[in-house]
Amino acid sequence: MADYFTTFSFEISKKDADFPLEDITQLIDAYREREYDNLPTWYKDKLSINDFGEDTVEEYMNIGYKLENDFLWIYSKEYPNIDSLVSIIQSVMKHYNSKKYISFEYAFTCNKLRTDGFGGGAVFINSSEVKFFDTGNWVREQIERFENKKIEDKK
């Protein structure tokens, strides 16, 4: 039996953020612990605890962080809910009308050398949009382009 993992590790520097990093940690904690009362007031006025769905309960969110004086380090070793993390970060950025961006990469790994066990992606977040990049999708697109070109070349 193989174990599959998704891992990431990235930092958000306070000097590069135009929003309080503490709001991100507060939201991560509130959703991980399902504690609506711990959500920032501005957030409660806009969204509810259920907006991130059941996947944000502690055993599924699997996101750790460490808030230091100069930066917020966010990481996961196993099975993070990347979509919820991205939603949390973007919610904070939208609230503060951020003009900055956050980006990070993630890796899909496996404890055995399974052919379907490796890959990864990246995400780019700003207050108005989120863009994901997935290596598996990219490879499939390249194969499709190659195959289509072969068909066109035969004509």
Provide a role label for each language-model segment:
Residues 1-35:
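Short, extreme N-terminal segment that most often corresponds to the first beta-strand
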